[in-house]
């Protein structure tokens, strides 16, 4: 763990890989573990990464690129990452770093809530001759 989530919170694809959700889910899982075990050293590493390395793959609204490698489409993101970022911010807030609540609130108000569909009337089920479950009730899902 110390080789990947270093004390400076730096990010390097050689250490972390390029799939952003793999990185953010480990970050939020380590925050959960640190909270559960009351491990301040581990929480400090999570905080250092949140404050430093995470910014190479996220923006102010919590949007996060899907792939951090060279050549990915910079317009492709993954909402799972955003959920991990919010979860980590809330844990850091609970840990006493209350300024992270503001980050979580901004992400929820400015990214997660506006991205939710309220009117699904325009969504039609696609042709589905093979009765694939993923193509049934697409809108309501």
Protein language model features and the residues they cover:
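Glycan-recognition and catalytic cores of secretory/periplasmic carbohydrate-active enzymes
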Residues: 1-141
């Amino acid at each position: 763990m110390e080789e990947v989530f270093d004390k400076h919170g730096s990010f390097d694809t050689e250490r972390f890989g390029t799939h952003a959700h793999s990185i953010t889910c480990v970050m939020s899982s380590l925050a959960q573990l640190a909270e559960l075990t009351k491990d301040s050293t581990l929480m400090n590493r999570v905080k250092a990464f949140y404050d430093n390395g995470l910014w190479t793959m996220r923006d102010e609204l919590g949007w996060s690129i899907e792939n951090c490698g060279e050549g990915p489409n910079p317009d492709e993101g993954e909402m799972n990452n955003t959920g991990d970022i919010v979860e980590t911010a809330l844990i850091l807030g609970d840990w006493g770093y209350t300024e992270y609540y503001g980050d979580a609130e901004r992400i929820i108000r400015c990214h997660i809530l506006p991205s939710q569909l309220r009117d699904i009337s325009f969504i039609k089920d696609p042709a589905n001759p093979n009765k694939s479950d993923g193509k049934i009730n697409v809108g309501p899902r």
